[in-house]
């Protein structure tokens, strides 16, 4: 086999080449309860004001502000309670001179009233109460339309539907939502050295860990995943299974077979399916031989057989492709700053991604590398919630340096919460 010369490109350029391709999924309609994590296919426009009416944000008494003027500790002013309403009810009383309506949170402000006195600001008797401070017009009132007004775009096309977006959709009566269909993914692990999870270990063999990991990463994004039988190092069978996967899926992910060894057939497979190779070497560690190809609106990802490199390739390249296909507004990985808490002295000829554990506090983020960090390492992935990104050309970093990190998880331990 002729060894192909590969020219590395920067990580950012690699992602840009992916999202520059003309690839989009169709719009579909799903039930609201099935829309979580989908991408909106259209703007959502407010069809009425929120709040729809002036309402009370507290439990208390609705009064006329003019009647409270002059109130003080030495001059308590008395009000007579003429009605009592809860959320969902509307008073038919007109609040008059030194009158009040007992009102619960969320209830509509009665006619004549223009301020709310919280219970704790009063001294109550049977059907009266007194106050010791004046209230201004609209004090303690949520005004009609103060959050959104009719015609406002409340959710944008391309926005990810999170639980908050579901609340907005429910507010405006969307029992069904127009979204972009999520791509389906085929996962194909390659390598004659691979055994299935339930196989007995043999000399020179390892269990397939990449396939289950990629499946989990894809399912975490809400994607439908097809798992294919582990492929041995055979060109003809490799071509056949990739062609089959391309007929059924929008994205095909293979793990292994992307290096330049005698048994790495992926370049030949891409030629056989007439795919355009977008890049086949990235200036990064691990995962420098990550390869991405494109044909007929579909992506083919050749991820490294090394678990950490495979994980890194999915986070950096597969995720942006999925978002791009769904028309997401934001497709690039989000980078934040963190303080490195221990030395990392290894030189970095290329951009290096280190599996790590970040801690987010009110004082900022700190990060510690997650155990053994070679490209073939597996355990470090399980204990990481981010990747540290060290720039190429650097000669190591000392504890206390500020570094860039990409969060892959964002939960915190209970003792880290500041309440």
UniProtKB/Swiss-Prot annotation:
Domain of life: Bacteria
Keywords: Magnesium, Metal-binding, Molybdenum, Molybdenum cofactor biosynthesis, Transferase
Pfam families given in the database record: MoCF_biosynth, MoeA_C, MoeA_N
Cofactor: Mg(2+)
GO cellular component, one term: cytosol
Pathway: Cofactor biosynthesis; molybdopterin biosynthesis
UniProt GO BP: Mo-molybdopterin cofactor biosynthetic process
Keyword Cell inner membrane: no
Gene Ontology terms for molecular function: metal ion binding; molybdopterin molybdotransferase activity
Keyword presence, Transferase: yes
Catalytic activity of the protein: adenylyl-molybdopterin + molybdate = Mo-molybdopterin + AMP + H(+)
InterPro entries cross-referenced by the UniProt entry: MoaB/Mog-like_dom_sf, MoaB/Mog_dom, MoeA-like, MoeA_C_domain_IV, MoeA_C_domain_IV_sf, MoeA_linker/N, MoeA_linker/N_sf
Cofactor note: Binds 1 Mg(2+) ion per subunit.
Assigned EC number: 2.10.1.1
Biological function: Catalyzes the insertion of molybdate into adenylated molybdopterin with the concomitant release of AMP.
Family: Belongs to the MoeA family.
Protein's name in the database: Molybdopterin molybdenumtransferase
UniProt source species: Staphylococcus aureus (strain MSSA476)
Gene that this polypeptide is encoded by: moeA
